[in-house]
């Protein structure tokens, strides 16, 4: 008898109306490229990402550099092979919160092709249009038992790979 009894059906609450907000239009160019294309002087400053998870002080520093006239913030990718907050994630926050052009460095040392493509797609989705392709410093000898170099390609091949992805059209529009 217990098995024959069906659970009582309750009426579901009406579904919430989905937002009709549209996604922002993808920008075709940025201030950095506009200045370069116009032959204007561009001020680029490198500011390494923090070693801690708090970006507050970093963003304050970036804001001061922007107010002082910096057009572009370059962000190293684990300089001298020491772990820091990911340069691409920091670039996304700088772009989103400050509206400043950010150029994350992308090293060959830490990512294979699949991880590189995934990161480039994410950067593009966040509005970060440029990367600096670099080979990257090797992992210090003392740390090589625990941390491994990837180096699936060098910076020249990485740049060629990025150009080929940009040429795929719908998946990752140009410029990258």
What does each model-identified segment do?
Residues 1, 43-47, 73-75, 102-106, ...:
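Hydrophobic faces of well-ordered beta-strands that scaffold small-molecule active sites
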Residues 1, 111-126:
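Catalytic cores of alpha/beta
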Residues 1-9, 127-140:
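Glycine-rich phosphate-binding active-site loops on the catalytic face of alpha/beta enzymes
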Residues 2-11, 81-105, 150-175:
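Alpha-helix-loop-beta-strand connector modules within alpha/beta enzyme cores
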Residues 4-56, 60, 170-175:
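N-terminal amphipathic alpha-helix/helix-capping segment at the start of soluble metabolic enzymes
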Residues 15-21, 25, 130-176:
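Conserved anion-binding
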Residues 52-65, 87, 113-120:
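Short, acidic/polar
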Residues 70-90, 139-150:
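Glycine-rich, proline-tolerant flexible connector loops at the mouths of alpha/beta enzymes
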């Amino acid at each position: 008898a217990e098995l024959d009894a069906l659970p009582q059906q309750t009426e579901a609450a009406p579904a919430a109306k989905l937002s009709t907000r549209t996604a922002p239009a993808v920008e075709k160019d940025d201030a950095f490229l506009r200045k370069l294309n116009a032959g204007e002087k561009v001020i680029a400053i490198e500011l390494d990402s923090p070693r801690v998870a708090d970006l507050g002080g970093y963003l304050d520093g970036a804001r001061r550099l922007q107010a002082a006239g910096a057009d572009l913030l370059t962000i190293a990718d684990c300089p001298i092979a020491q772990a820091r907050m990911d340069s691409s994630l920091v670039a996304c926050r700088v772009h989103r919160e400050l509206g400043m052009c950010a150029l994350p460095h992308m090293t060959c040392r830490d990512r294979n092709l699949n991880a590189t493509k995934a990161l480039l797609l994410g950067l593009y989705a966040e509005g970060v249009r440029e990367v600096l392709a670099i080979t990257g410093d090797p992992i210090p000898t003392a740390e090589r038992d625990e941390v491994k170099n990837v180096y699936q390609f060098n910076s020249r091949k990485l740049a060629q790979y990025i150009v080929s992805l940009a040429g795929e059209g719908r998946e990752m529009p140009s410029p990258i």
